[in-house]
Amino acid sequence: MKSTPTEPLSKESLPKESIVIVWFKRDLRIHDHEPLTTAASLQNKGIKVLPLYVVEPDYWQLPDSSARHWRFISQSLAELNQALLSLGQGLWVEHSTVISVLQKLAAHFNIVGIYSHQESGNLWTYQRDKDVTIWCLKNKIKWHESEAYGVFRRFNDRDRWAYYWEKYMVREKSIAPVSLAKIESLKVYNDRPGFDLPALDLTVLERDENKHLQEGGRSRGSACFKSFLNERGKQYSFNMSSPLTAFRSCSRLSPHIAFGTLSLREIVQKLRKQAKTPHLEDSWKRSLRSFDSRLHWHCHFIQKLETEPLFETHNMLPVFDGLRENAFNEDYFEAWKSGNTGYPFIDACMRCLRHTGWLNFRMRAMLVSFSSYQLWLHWQRPAWHLAQCFTDYEPGIHYSQIQMQSGTTGINTLRIYNPVKQSQDQDPKGVFIKRWVPELSEYNDEYIHEPWTMPMAMQQQKGCIIGTSYPQPIVEHVAALREARAKFTAFKQHHPEFWQQAQALNAKHGSRKRKAKSKTKGTNKKIANTRTDIDQLSLFQPI
């Protein structure tokens, strides 16, 4: 009996297969991933799991996006895909808007639900998530969002925040699924490799500045954490302030936390387990406690942006509107961006950052302080430049700290750094300067911090003429600082609403972790009874 030939099934003739989507964002791992674990538990009901990552073109055109972010993400995605393939279903990557991707998937699959972590990103991702929420409501698809890392949505009780953060961190981690059923019908939906990363045209920073960047992927993050816990972290609390020692002694986990190759909870739990090691040396105990504290502050600052997304674009204290915006000096900005201000330590830090994607917290704070006070630049465009430079760019920490360092929070002491003193304190022999500002490699200790003071005959002998081979200082920093302080004082005096706004801001966003000091100085006396942020926490990525 002859069989009757049949035509291949078309997309339209196939019944819709039921799936749930796990939307990966800044959580590029399978371990301690609650959305993935929860979605996988539905497989016993015949519902398959589609792991999805969307490369969104408009996002990568934003002024705070850069090639080094994509480089780290793409490396992490490749490793995530391998981990998912080992479970049975690889990562499906789309290059489009999330709404378009969901619309296409909904035309071919019965989407039972979408699972993801909450994202406390920039304003663009905030608006995108609002659009996805509307789409899900219109299409009667439930979007389940899990807490990402001790940052809580629609949370207004700062007095209880630390309690809930701790409760989240000690909670049992989510277990990775054992297997994921392969979705064979994806071949009919789109006959292409599911894991297909686009070649993005991102030239924000020169390609030759990407030689020393940290690489992404969970395996690298795990190895980095292991070396910190077992060796590098011993002198963390002592070595974090100088760029000479911070590159080795700091954890270097910040990009892995920012893009989620490791979960903050697993880091906290392993860290605390290590701290309980019998007969642990005091130096280790001190460093591990210090690191644990900074993980707490990491979320404290992200919570601010989660609660007040407009901190990305608006002064935290509206009274400061107009303080610097109309006095932006393009020449100063370009000199600062390129590391050509004439202040060797400032320039070394900026050039180092551009090449490595990382800098320790004190030096990050110094760069912002210099742009804000000595150069009197409004913080928005410097914030974008630094965001592009930082491989570990985390919007919540970034904009909170940018505003703190530029003085627009009203609840923190003005953090004004003397670039020469910082140079002398943190790089006394000029080792760091000479590495990143090779023009000054022949200058000795006496002149390396203030090369413009070297006699001309000696400059000629060294082969580096200040003003020709290396720039003169673009401002006189002592006079510039004096002028900046005077401007702040006058501005506050002419705006009596300052104190009321500062108290309201502190009530909503200030830390409650420590009690305020009994003695205070300067203009913050009036809010000392409520303020508890402490000066040493100039963190950016506090790890």
At which residue positions do the language-model features occur?
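Trp/Phe/Arg-rich N-terminal binding region typifying the photolyase-homology
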Residues: 1-180, 351, 400-401, 478, ...
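Glycine- and acidic
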Residues: 21-22, 61-64, 115-118, 206-209, ...
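Short, glycine/acidic-rich beta->alpha junctions
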Residues: 30-31, 124-128, 248-249, 287, ...
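Active-site-proximal binding-pocket segments
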Residues: 252-445
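Soluble or luminal CAZymes and related metallo-dependent hydrolases
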Residues: 31, 72, 76, 217, ...
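Alpha-helical packing segments of well-folded alpha/beta enzyme cores
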Residues: 35, 76, 80, 221-224, ...
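Glycine/tryptophan-enriched, flexible segments
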Residues: 139-141, 160-319, 431-543
